[in-house]
């Protein structure tokens, strides 16, 4: 089981990646960890924020139905999603539907935060008013249950 630590503005949570539902995309994400970026609120999507730098994940999207693995249309608090077309990762802290100015879009369901979301959601919601913050994604070593630095 691939587990990651997600850190935002001093709060860290643990998440499990969906290796069974999106094995190729999860594998590519795992390869590019640790990853750090400034994130901003996703104003059209509801309770969600997104990365501003493209993740270095190359996928042959033509091989997947809908151009992605594990396509999902709605997100609930704690969902981690990825849009291959623009290489953007997003995390829902509330009810959300990944949207662009052109409307709602299907995204790849990558994983889910397993820890208590309250403190993390509070920091994520503040992005609307405080502006960009640093997000860090790191692998968690399953043997030691420790987050490498």
Label each PLM-derived region with a short phrase.
Residues 1-21:
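N-terminal intrinsically disordered, low-complexity, charge/repeat-rich segments that act as generic
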Residues 17-149:
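Glycine-rich active-site loops that engage anionic ligands at enzyme catalytic sites
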């Amino acid at each position: 089981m691939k587990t990651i630590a997600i850190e935002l503005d001093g709060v860290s949570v643990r998440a499990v990646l969906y290796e069974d539902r999106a094995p190729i995309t999860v594998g590519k994400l795992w390869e590019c960890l640790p990853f750090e970026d400034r994130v901003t609120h996703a104003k059209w999507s509801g309770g969600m924020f997104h990365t501003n730098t493209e993740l270095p994940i190359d996928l042959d999207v033509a091989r997947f139905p809908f151009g992605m693995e594990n396509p999902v249309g709605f997100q609930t608090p704690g969902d981690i999603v990825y849009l291959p077309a623009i290489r953007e990762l997003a995390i829902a802290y509330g009810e959300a539907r990944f949207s662009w100015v052109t409307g709602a879009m299907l995204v790849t369901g990558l994983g889910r935060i397993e820890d208590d979301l309250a403190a993390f959601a509070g920091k994520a919601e503040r992005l609307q008013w405080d502006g960009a913050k640093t997000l860090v994604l790191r692998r968690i070593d399953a043997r030691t249950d420790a987050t490498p630095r």
